[in-house]
């Protein structure tokens, strides 16, 4: 039993930073955080677009993809057939057509001086969807995670 406590403590210390990378600001719903991170109907330059995300998290996010479409159109993907997500959950949905998107990747800097490169893409995407929370738009399901780009 004495040996278990140090191992548990080590696990918690190592797991803490991983959890922070996937956490969202608690005053936002997961759908609203998804919208902030991934919905950008009109393309913006990556340095500018990413500063909005980084200001919430107080660090330079290493990579982010912006879908150049409306939240309504992306939420409509949630009505399509469910598929298995990367995490083995069954709440993912693939877009029926490709969309324009921008992939932003951190090239240098420390928060708040984060610098990004941009790559324009035209691809399909997969989103994880959940039932909406009270302050979310009134759809049956709303996107909460960008699972992959195809």
Curated annotation (Swiss-Prot):
SUPFAM superfamilies: RNase A-like
PROSITE patterns from the UniProt entry: RNASE_PANCREATIC (PS00127)
Site, Facilitates cleavage of polynucleotide substrates: residue positions: 59
InterPro entries from the UniProt entry: RNaseA (IPR001427), RNaseA-like_dom_sf (IPR036816), RNaseA_AS (IPR023411), RNaseA_domain (IPR023412)
Cystines in this chain: 46-104, 60-114, 78-129, 85-92
Keywords from the named record: Antibiotic, Antimicrobial, Disulfide bond, Endonuclease, Glycoprotein, Hydrolase, Lysosome, Nuclease, Secreted, Signal
Residues reported in the UniProt entry to bind substrate: 61-65, 86, 105
Record SMART domains: RNAse_Pc
Signal peptide: 1-23
Alphabetized Gene3D superfamilies for the sequence: Ribonuclease A-like domain
Keyword presence, Glycoprotein: yes
Compartments in which it is found: Secreted; Lysosome; Cytoplasmic granule
CDD domains per the UniProt record, alphabetical: RNase_A_canonical
GO CC terms in record: extracellular space; lysosome
EC number of the protein: 3.1.27.-
Family the entry assigns: Belongs to the pancreatic ribonuclease family.
UniProt subunit comment: Interacts (via N-terminus) with bacterial lipopolysaccharide (LPS).
Name of the protein: Ribonuclease K6
Organism (species): Chlorocebus aethiops (Green monkey)
Gene: RNASE6
């Amino acid at each position: 039993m004495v040996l278990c406590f140090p191992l548990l403590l080590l696990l918690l210390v190592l797991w803490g930073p991983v959890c922070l990378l996937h956490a969202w600001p608690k005053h936002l719903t997961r759908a609203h955080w998804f919208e902030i991170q991934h919905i950008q109907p009109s393309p913006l330059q990556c340095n500018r677009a990413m500063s909005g995300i980084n200001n919430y998290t107080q660090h330079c996010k290493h990579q982010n993809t912006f879908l150049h479409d409306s939240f309504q159109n992306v939420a409509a993907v949630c009505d399509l057939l469910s598929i298995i997500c990367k995490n083995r959950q069954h709440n993912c949905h693939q877009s029926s057509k490709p969309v324009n998107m921008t992939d932003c990747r951190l090239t240098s800097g420390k928060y708040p001086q984060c610098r990004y490169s941009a790559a324009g893409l035209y691809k399909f995407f997969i989103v994880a969807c959940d039932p909406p929370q009270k302050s979310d738009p009134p759809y049956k399901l709303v996107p909460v995670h960008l699972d992959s780009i195809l």
